[in-house]
Regions:
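Flexible, gly/pro- and Lys/Arg-enriched active-site loops
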Residues: 38, 46-54, 65-72, 76-160
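Solvent-exposed residues in well-ordered beta-strands and their adjoining turns
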Residues: 9, 62-64
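N-terminal beta1-alpha1 ligand-phosphate binding loop
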Residues: 1-32, 37-44
């Protein structure tokens, strides 16, 4: 059994509708035991592409599915939502990223595959990931630093 923390975002169309769709699809997945999510927050886009604001959050999923299979599941959900990968860091109907995984004992599960790297390589530098993560996992820490302390460090260092 694994606990997945999945970043979710949308900046096209019915943004909230796409985020809710992702939650609903995960709830209906056979290997999933429970699904919870943070509140949604509006954030400016991250990266070099000019585009509209995002609605972001974190989905917490407890499931028996292995990490690469979970990646396949969320890629399928993105596809069902009409996600098109035309521009790197470009606008999207739905973006799902596995940010963090823990095993049944609460230990970090690290993955280094050609298609999946966990912990997500940029998660610790993105307030739009850390703020909703703190909501669903307030005691989270990484490399000995609490999420609240990290957020204080990031405050003012990045646009968002």
């Amino acid at each position: 059994m694994y606990t997945y923390y999945i970043g979710v975002g949308s900046n096209l169309g019915d943004r909230e509708g796409y985020l809710v769709f992702a939650v609903e699809q995960l709830v209906c997945t056979d290997s999933v035991r429970s699904v919870d999510h943070s509140s949604w927050i509006e954030t400016p886009p991250w990266g070099p592409v000019e585009q509209g604001p995002f609605l972001n959050g974190i989905i917490k999923v407890v499931a028996s599915i292995e990490p690469v299979a979970m990646l396949e599941t969320i890629l399928h959900i993105e596809c069902l939502a009409g996600r098109q990968r035309e521009i790197h860091w470009g606008p999207r109907t739905l973006d799902l990223d596995i940010v963090w995984i823990e095993d049944e004992k609460g230990h970090c599960v690290r993955v280094e595959e050609s298609t999946l790297v966990v912990p997500h390589p940029y998660f610790w530098d993105r307030r739009f990931v850390l703020e909703p993560l703190e909501e669903v996992y307030p005691n989270f820490s990484y490399e000995g630093v609490s999420i609240s302390k990290r957020l204080k460090t990031l405050h003012g260092l990045e646009v968002y």
